[in-house]
């Protein structure tokens, strides 16, 4: 199909068409893509190096020419469009855990209040594009339709008190493993 792809190290993710579910509508106007689904509406500008077409219930991304830059943008743009569709259908979630004595989280309106062992409470203002829930005082769940924003908000909250390597106290992702160091020995 694409004979110019001779490099064995290159990903071929761009070749895969993106299937558009029944409950999602996709509009393509030049290099602007608009995806609307049950969770909301997302827009995306693709690179000028790729060509995007809507064929029946599939979105196909192709490079415009044989240049290295076109091939680099090909797979990236295909993945970003697939993430748009996933975001408006199921959404993205990041879960954080608070480990430490007295470490707590609580929601108060549009503010996430964190007790992290400092002499004061840390207040985190929740952006309008994400929804934060606190199922337990030591757990935080961040949900949204934009993977980049959800990940950035989770990273910003984690930055308030990163897990330290000796006792593991701090805020960590649920699936994160903190490598424990040994203390000093006499």
Please provide the spans of the model-predicted regions.
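Ribosome-associated RNA-binding proteins
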Residues: 2-186
């Amino acid at each position: 199909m694409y004979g110019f792809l001779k490099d064995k190290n290159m990903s071929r993710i761009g070749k895969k068409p993106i299937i558009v579910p029944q409950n999602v509508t996709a509009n393509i106007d030049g290099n602007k893509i608009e995806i609307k689904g049950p969770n909301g509406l997302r827009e995306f500008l693709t690179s000028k190096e790729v060509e995007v077409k809507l064929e029946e219930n599939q979105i196909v991304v192709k490079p415009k020419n044989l240049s290295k830059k076109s091939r680099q943008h090909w797979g990236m743009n295909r993945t970003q469009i697939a993430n748009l569709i996933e975001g408006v259908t199921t959404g993205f979630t990041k879960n954080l855990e608070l480990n430490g004595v007295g470490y707590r989280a609580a929601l108060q309106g549009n503010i996430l209040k964190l007790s992290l062992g400092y002499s004061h409470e840390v207040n985190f203002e929740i952006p309008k594009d994400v929804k934060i829930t606190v199922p337990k005082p030591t757990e935080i769940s961040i949900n949204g339709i934009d993977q980049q924003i959800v990940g950035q908000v989770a990273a910003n909250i984690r930055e308030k008190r990163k897990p330290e390597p000796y006792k593991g106290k701090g805020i960590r992702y649920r699936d994160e493993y903190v490598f424990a160091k040994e203390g000093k020995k006499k």
